[in-house]
């Protein structure tokens, strides 16, 4: 029997098949700011070109005769940022002149000349560019005629590093600069974490990182998590930490630190890229040697690890449509990895033999594949008289698998201790908090409520669209109140 896989691996495109020269597929000449566009700088004969590949229409690349030192496409629209301009190659101005063009309108939107060379830059949102110089980091908004604003000075721990990435949380209150350098026959990762509110930096040893928003069970607001992976002399680690003060009323996230496994034959391997899937609350970690690691963000459990590319994947972005990660390797393959929805829960349950994690992820992401686990848990709690817990399991089980007439009948048969809420009403209470009741649930909830003469409750639920209207419900209301 072939083993089920919890991931889906896809090759979207081979860049050499759409006219891209293999020599142009590198960190210095190819950029991918999102899953929408790939941008390549190429020399064709004597002329310099910028090639834009729309990943929704990859067989029709747009070629423009542009001479630039660097080119990055906006993550959302056909807007391109160019560094250096014709005639500045090799001059002091090459790294300082920044221009933003709207490709469709064929118009220049903004331009700015920096005092210092920009050695790394990145779109951090559809309307903001981050600019990194040897000494500082700036944010440049596309709004109006605003100038780049200095966010922070670089920490000395990044001196002499090649800057490979820059990340922010969604509100741009936490900023992170990542660099690497060769030391004692290994690649060392150096990061600078900066808090805009506190105006202070923390140097951290790390190779790849990402921020994530994660809503813990029972919390009203999502927690802002900082996830980073590192390979030190001692070994590999993944850390997941909540940054800043937890939002009011939230339980704090317990920080996690787990080992990142590197096989014996990958002595010099290290993490190079990380993306967090908001869709599945998982971390995708990619290493220099082309291994993918998949972690659950809540528990930091490693769900899966395998080699997906024999060549280094040197640029990645979130793959929005699948909740996955997309990347380009040195060979010019455009690859993506995402969660295989139908397989991940059975895989965690049977291959990892971790039913608790299977239940958690199934509930969190409304995924099928753990039906028998939910039925077993519900029956066990019910038999133990833990009706409130059983009600929670029945209400939260994915795809409504336990929201059946049988479940309601089971709760109806349980005697209610004097002065306490009946288990049936506890069950309906949880369902009402979550959204609309189905036809059968609506009838069975309204029956005892109308018998108690509490018609105003029913009117409230109808107004809030919590009940599914049906002929039978109408008849029930008429019987209780013929007026």
Predicted regions and their residues:
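Extended alpha-helical assembly domains of large eukaryotic scaffold proteins
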Residues: 9, 16-483
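PEST-like, low-complexity acidic/proline-rich intrinsically disordered segments
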Residues: 1-13
